[in-house]
């Protein structure tokens, strides 16, 4: 044990937090989570241990701007200014100091290992009592599961130790410091340490004791570590559970270890042995260790699909059977290996349906509770995810247990990121930083290696490629050869990774960056000598209204076996709740706390909002990742299962044929599909309707029974096909009433019964419509070529750092947002059965014509207004965001009804999950509340739209909202939006894709850009 004078001044004088060679003082060795049961049955059933006591709850807390400002008296008693805070928590969430959101840029001046003198410091204290029996015998430990970023610990005024690495436990022996009666802990937490240079992750920078604190009492002679692994024969019919157990304390000949394996209430195998292992070298064996091997016949294998778990109980006892203590863990029989260029689980090639997940809560910051963790897992499973990457640090220890039990594959990632260094490997190639990096990797492995859900180790994130990575890669491969190692830094295919694991590589497009080229994922596989599998560690940047082009990745994954999926960036928006002057909550992002530097809304890249409400993009991910694929051939549906291990036993296939959303025929068939098998379903003769319309066949896979992760009736997969229709021509009924055209100096006015249309001759716009005396428009109907910029349109562009390549900057520079319409033509003609208005406009900016729009409005005797639009786009202007029409309707109706793709928001490059049907939703549901306002709520493939007294028919895309595109564009946060008068309608003949391969470079695929020079669309607008 390192002995240091207890005084605060002496401890601070050492400045351990600025010495990369000091990552801990007196911290105990890493190991799997312990409970020290004194009853093996309680260990088997995972009951709460009487030897494990939580110290979570109210602690006393005082904040200081620097550690030197803390008075020496704090070691002995609470300070007058101390407040009460809940542990675990981040002190920034209690109003102390400010959270800082930055992605790459370090929040402190870069001068490793030194940190600012102004180093916010939190002083925690807690008084507690210890059982008398704990003082009389054994060892009492204190466990801090997570403290950011470094801390010193005192107990009863005596210095105990020091720890850093905010995402792994720091555990200390308190036995020599405790006393009978009341005891007092004092924990000094520093916001910045040299460890902060290794924790430059894209997240909020927060501080404090943010994970659980507990006391653990272990006997003097104790289990100090245990590791379980599973081995198999070739066909997985026989297995061996290999358990290595290590003890500490007084080694006696009468000590024994028993390892028993349980499946529920049934003991499957058991073995007992004294300590003393196999001979290691010429000096002998480890006297304090023993390895037991238990044979298991026909083990039930673990996978994310079927997470079969056993329970291993490790008992330390005497030769006569007297139990000293027991530890236990869940065991999953599974094998991970790479063979022939494929990542295999239990001999089957995996397809990773993965997502990156930060530990984030809108109210609690980086504090995770079981309820939130389970909520995340259930949502992931319900949306066809089977894997999660712990980005970018080891997670709360409970997370892994839950992933074991519910079934998720885990990439466990070391808490190492040096993204802001120049070059990025400045520290990771420096041997002085090897001890700090080594602690972060080795302790992660020692804590988590018993979890079957952990199938891949990661050396960290965005830290370049240095010699330290190579050393740690070799250490892991030596200690745990049962798992592959991945690491993206330095080019995604270095010698420090078993898997090519690029981030944001595109399907077909190379990005030849200097030194670290990012090839297309297809090309990467074909590079000379490259035989590794490729799994994208990050892809499909889900920032705001995004995930366009997601289907293209999944087409490639299914086409090329060595493209084994990837991890979407990322799971949850990292917004935080703030309150306005009236106490109303609102969602905040970078800069909203006065934090500098900051990266604005770049912290919000989630498939779900911070409160776990899904983004519309989540449905697209669910659909593309679904485990059943469908093919229609004539009257036969071929259903293919992509499950590797699970036989469909809880699935019904519902099918329905509908004409324009009206059901004509339906049925259901139980699915009985073997893993990776097929089932052919013969449909009856399908009806052929006589009336015109779109005929669609829809299939949905429904789970009739609830599961551990879903309710009864859960829909897991679906597909639609448009069927051939009989040609049916419906002639419009002739009307003997002809609308009346009145011409004045300023207007053309058309009147039919109680309806009127007014066209302004100076502007050439439809300026007003009346039904009776009620005006229908608040603004004229006009062309629209822009949208409120998406995050993907903006990229990294901001006022102080313009990116001229960003879509929004190109549109601004070309004048798309400032363009004004010059009238070229406005004429009216009375036809035999209608009135025809013809207009033409040149949309210009600074004398340059960007678009020419020609329209005809044909108003007939039935009151229908048929609009045709022809647009010419200048060859030298950027491709526009949309080609459509917009106006502000006077009405505010409660509901929106449409025949088209839905029900969720969809865009041209993100619509495979949408279904063609007749949908009816509240107006409020047509708006997607992205925290950073932008274009939202589009519905594509629309044939009919009904809103209030209006109906539109044609082939178009629309969104309808209380917010104008102008307001969305000018507003920084969703809570600042205000409902405008009436309703804004945007009807597009064409709309550009949204992109999403990444959010910092233009990523809309060429096929979804509006690159043609001419466009034509038409629609009919009528009043009900």
From Swiss-Prot:
Q: Which GO terms describe its cellular component?
A: beta-galactosidase complex
Into which EC class is this enzyme placed? hydrolase
Q: Which GO terms describe its molecular function?
A: beta-galactosidase activity; carbohydrate binding; magnesium ion binding
Positions bound to substrate: 103, 202, 462, 538-541, 605, 1000
Q: Which SUPFAM superfamilies match?
A: (Trans)glycosidases, beta-Galactosidase/glucuronidase domain, Galactose mutarotase-like, Galactose-binding domain-like
Q: How is the cofactor bound?
A: Binds 2 magnesium ions per monomer.
In short, the EC number is 3.2.1.23
Positions that bind Mg(2+) 1: 417, 419, 462
**Per its UniProt record, what PROSITE patterns does this chain match?**
GLYCOSYL_HYDROL_F2_1, GLYCOSYL_HYDROL_F2_2
One BP annotation, GO: lactose catabolic process
Its recorded reaction(s) are: Hydrolysis of terminal non-reducing beta-D-galactose residues in beta-D-galactosides
- Residues engaged in binding Na(+): 202, 602, 605
- Please give the cofactor(s) recorded in the UniProt entry for this protein: Mg(2+); Na(+)
On subunit structure and binding partners, the annotation says:
Homotetramer.
Q: Which family does it belong to?
A: Belongs to the glycosyl hydrolase 2 family.
Q: What is this protein called?
A: Beta-galactosidase
Q: Which gene is annotated as encoding this protein in its UniProt record?
A: lacZ
């Amino acid at each position: 044990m390192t002995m240091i004078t207890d005084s605060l001044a002496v401890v601070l004088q050492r400045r351990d937090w600025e010495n990369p060679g000091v990552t801990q003082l007196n911290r105990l060795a890493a190991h799997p989570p312990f409970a020290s049961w004194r009853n093996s049955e309680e260990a088997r059933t995972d009951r709460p241990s009487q030897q494990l006591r939580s110290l979570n709850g109210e602690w006393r807390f005082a904040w200081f701007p620097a550690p030197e400002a803390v008075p020496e008296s704090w070691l002995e008693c609470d300070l007058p200014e101390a407040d009460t805070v809940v542990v675990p928590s981040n002190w920034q969430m209690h109003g102390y100091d400010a959270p800082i959101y930055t992605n790459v840029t370090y929040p402190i001046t870069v001068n490793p290992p030194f940190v600012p003198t102004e180093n916010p410091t939190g002083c925690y204290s807690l008084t507690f009592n210890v059982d008398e029996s704990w003082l009389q015998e054994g060892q009492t430990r204190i466990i801090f599961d997570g403290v950011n970023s470094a801390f010193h610990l005192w107990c009863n005024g005596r210095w105990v130790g020091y720890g850093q690495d905010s995402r792994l436990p720091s555990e200390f022996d308190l036995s020599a410091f405790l006393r009978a009666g009341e005891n007092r802990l004092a924990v000094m937490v520093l916001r910045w340490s040299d460890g902060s240079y290794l924790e430059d992750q894209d997240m909020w920078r927060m501080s404090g004791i943010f994970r659980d604190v507990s006391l653990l009492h272990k006997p003097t002679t104790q289990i100090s570590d245990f590791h379980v692994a599973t081995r198999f024969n070739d066909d997985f019919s026989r297995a061996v559970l290999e358990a290595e157990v290590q003890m500490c304390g007084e080694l006696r000949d009468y000590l024994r270890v028993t390892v028993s394996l349980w499946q529920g209430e049934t003991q499957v195998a058991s073995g007992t042995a004294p300590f003393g292992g196999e001979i290691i070298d010429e000096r002998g064996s480890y006297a304090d260790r023993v390895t037991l091997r238990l044979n298991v016949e026909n083990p039930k294998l673990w996978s994310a699909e079927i997470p079969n778990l056993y329970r291993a109980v490790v008992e330390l006892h005497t030769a006569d059977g007297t139990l000293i203590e027991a530890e236990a863990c869940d065991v999953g029989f599974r094998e991970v290996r790479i063979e022939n260029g494929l990542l295999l689980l239990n001999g089957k090639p995996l397809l990773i349906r993965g997502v990156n997940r930060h530990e984030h809560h809108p109210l609690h910051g980086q504090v995770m509770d079981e309820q939130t963790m389970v909520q995340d897992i259930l949502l992931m499973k319900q949306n066809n995810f089977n894997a999660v990457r712990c980005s970018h640090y080891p997670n709360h220890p409970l997370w892994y247990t839950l992933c074991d039990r519910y079934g998720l594959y885990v990439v466990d990632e070391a808490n190492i990121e040096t993204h802001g260094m120049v070059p990025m490997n400045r520290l990771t190639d420096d041997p002085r930083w090897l001890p700090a990096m080594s602690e972060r990797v080795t302790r992660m492995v020692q804590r988590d290696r018993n979890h079957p859900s952990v199938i891949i180790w990661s050396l960290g994130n965005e830290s370049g490629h240095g010699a330290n990575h190579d050393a740690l890669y070799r250490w892991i491969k030596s200690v745990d050869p049962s798992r592959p190692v991945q690491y993206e830094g330095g080019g995604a295919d270095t010698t420090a990774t078993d898997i090519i694991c690029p981030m944001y590589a595109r399907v077909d497009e190379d990005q030849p960056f200097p030194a670290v080229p990012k090839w297309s994922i297809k090309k990467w596989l074909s590079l000379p000598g490259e035989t590794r599998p490729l799994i994208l560690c990050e892809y499909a940047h889900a920032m705001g209204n995004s995930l366009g082009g997601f289907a293209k990745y999944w087409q490639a994954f299914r086409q090329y076996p060595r493209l084994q999926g990837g991890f979407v960036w990322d799971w949850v928006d990292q917004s935080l709740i703030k309150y306005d002057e009236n106490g109303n909550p609102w969602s905040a992002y970078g800069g909203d706390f006065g934090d500098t530097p900051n990266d604005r809304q770049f912290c919000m890249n989630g498939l779900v909002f911070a409160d776990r409400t899904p983004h519309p993009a989540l449905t697209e991910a669910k659909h593309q990742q679904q485990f059943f694929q469908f093919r229609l051939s004539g009257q036969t549906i071929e259903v293919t299962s992509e499950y590797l291990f699970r036989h469909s036993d809880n699935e019904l296939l519902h099918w329905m044929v509908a004409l324009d959303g009206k059901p004509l025929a339906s049925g259901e068939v139980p699915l009985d599909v073997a893993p990776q098998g097929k089932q052919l379903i013969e449909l009856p003769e399908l009806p052929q309707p006589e009336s015109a319309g779109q005929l669609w066949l829809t299939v949905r896979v429904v789970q009739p029974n609830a599961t551990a992760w879903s309710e009864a009736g859960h829909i897991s997969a679906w597909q639609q096909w448009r069927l051939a229709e009989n040609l049916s021509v419906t002639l419009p009924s002739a009307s003997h009433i002809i609308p009346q055209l009145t011409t004045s100096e300023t207007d053309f006015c058309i009147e039919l019964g109680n309806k009127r249309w007014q066209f302004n001759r100076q502007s050439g716009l439809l300026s007003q419509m009346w039904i009776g005396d009620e005006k229908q428009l608040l603004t004229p109907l006009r062309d629209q070529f822009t949208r409120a910029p998406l995050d993907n349109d903006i990229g990294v562009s901001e006022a102080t750092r313009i990116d001229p390549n960003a879509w929004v900057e190109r549109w601004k520079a070309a004048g798309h947002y400032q363009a004004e319409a010059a009238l070229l033509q406005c004429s009216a003609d009375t036809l035999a059965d209608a009135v025809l208005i013809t207009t033409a406009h040149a949309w210009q900016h600074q004398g340059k014509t960007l678009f020419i729009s020609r329209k005809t409005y044909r108003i007939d005797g039935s009151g229908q207004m048929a609009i045709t639009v022809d647009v010419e786009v200048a060859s030298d202007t950027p491709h526009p965001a949309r080609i459509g029409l917009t106006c502000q309707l006077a009405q505010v109706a409660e509901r929106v009804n449409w025949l088209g793709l839905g029900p969720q928001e969809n865009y041209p490059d993100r619509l495979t999950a949408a279904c063609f049907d007749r949908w009816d939703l509240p107006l409020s549901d047509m708006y997607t509340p992205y925290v950073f306002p932008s274009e939202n709520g589009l519905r594509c493939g629309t044939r009919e739209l009904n809103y209030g007294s209006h109906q539109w028919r044609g082939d178009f895309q629309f969104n309808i909202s209380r917010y104008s595109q102008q307001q969305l564009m000018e507003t920084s946060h969703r809570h600042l939006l205000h409902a405008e008068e009436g309703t804004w309608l945007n009807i597009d003949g064409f709309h550009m894709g949204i992109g999403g391969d990444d959010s910092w470079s233009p990523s809309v695929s060429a096929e979804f850009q509006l690159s043609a020079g001419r466009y034509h669309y038409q629609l009919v607008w009528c009043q009900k």
